[in-house]
A protein has these predicted regions:
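Walker B catalytic acidic pair
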Residues: 285-286
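Conserved core of the PLP fold type I
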Residues: 72-279, 289-291
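Conserved N-terminal helix/loop that builds the PLP phosphate-binding region
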Residues: 1-104
């Protein structure tokens, strides 16, 4: 793209830029772009899916080998030496797509985090077969370990990690997480009907709609980002958070639909508010955090 065209794009809003790039991409296969800035991206990552399906085939082999008396039925996995059988399976099908990914994932986790190989593969097999209630029910042990390390890497970057440990809860998706959070805040009397919450706007539509539902009946105060300031939140808007009647602040970062991350300066200002108001609940939706 010519620099003159880039300069022209710099004058457009994020929505106009997105639409312009999509229009460019549709003119030629050579210009096809990966678009992750929407609810349903126009692409999928094939490597992990290939590995997923190969893992499923191994899990079925395990199941069939332990319950061979009935055609069409399988049994529970056996943990003892299951990692050895897994590696034998990978050696047998090493030319299949996804197998090398599985081997590398297994070796990385067992080497980097000193995880017992049999315990790891057994969890994978039981999980992909779906033949048991998960323990713990919020997220499987090694799945949580892996996801936590990934989140620490992507969300903390070069910054020091916060003190202490945080737990992860695996859910069906971002909107489902919102429902669970609203229900949890209500059930624990942290938010009650008639309370006021602040919402960083513009924002993903359900954040606007859900507080108005009869189940929650919450009042909303919008903390409006300024398009003229590259979608940062002005000090005058952040001042609204100093109102003690505001019980919580819901924020999407990077933003949706603007697709812009908050600057470090803005984040520090929010942190200052949180330090002044330890009673203020901060809820951040970081679904696009890995793109920041």
């Amino acid at each position: 793209m010519k620099r003159t065209d880039e300069k022209r794009l710099e004058t457009l809003s994020p929505f106009e830029v997105k639409n312009t790039l999509i229009d460019l991409a549709q003119h030629s296969h050579e210009k096809t772009m990966i678009n992750a800035g929407r609810g349903n991206p126009n692409w999928v990552a094939t490597a992990p899916r290939e590995a997923f399906f190969q893992l499923g085939m191994f899990a079925l082999e395990e199941s069939k080998s332990n319950f061979s008396g009935y055609e069409g039925f399988g049994g529970m996995g056996v943990q003892q030496d299951i990692s050895l059988r897994f590696l034998q399976f990978c050696e047998k099908y090493e030319d299949q797509e996804g197998v090398q990914f599985l081997i590398e994932a297994f070796q990385f986790i067992t080497d980097q985090y000193q995880v017992d190989g049999d315990a790891l593969i057994y969890e994978w097999v039981e999980g992909i077969l779906g033949n048991n209630y998960p323990v713990p029910d919020r997220m499987l042990k090694y799945s949580e370990l892996i996801a936590r390390k990934y989140i620490e890497q992507e969300m903390a970057g070069s910054q020091p990690l916060p003190a202490g440990k945080f737990d992860l809860f695996a859910v069906e998706g971002g909107t489902a997480a919102m429902v669970y959070i609203f229900n949890t805040l209500k059930s624990n009397r942290l938010l009650n009907p008639g309370d006021t919450i602040a919402i960083g706007a513009p924002i993903f539509t359900p954040y606007i709609e859900m507080p108005e539902l009869e189940d929650y009946a919450l009042n909303k105060v919008e903390i409006m980002a300024d398009e003229a300031s590259a979608w940062q939140i002005p000090d005058s808007e952040l001042e609204k958070l100093n109102d003690p009647s505001v019980k919580a602040f819901f924020l999407v970062n990077p933003s949706n639909p603007a697709s812009v991350r908050l600057s470090d300066e803005t984040l520090y200002k929010i942190a200052e508010v949180a330090n002044r108001r330890p009673d203020l609940i901060l809820l951040t939706d970081d679904v696009y955090g890995t793109f920041a």
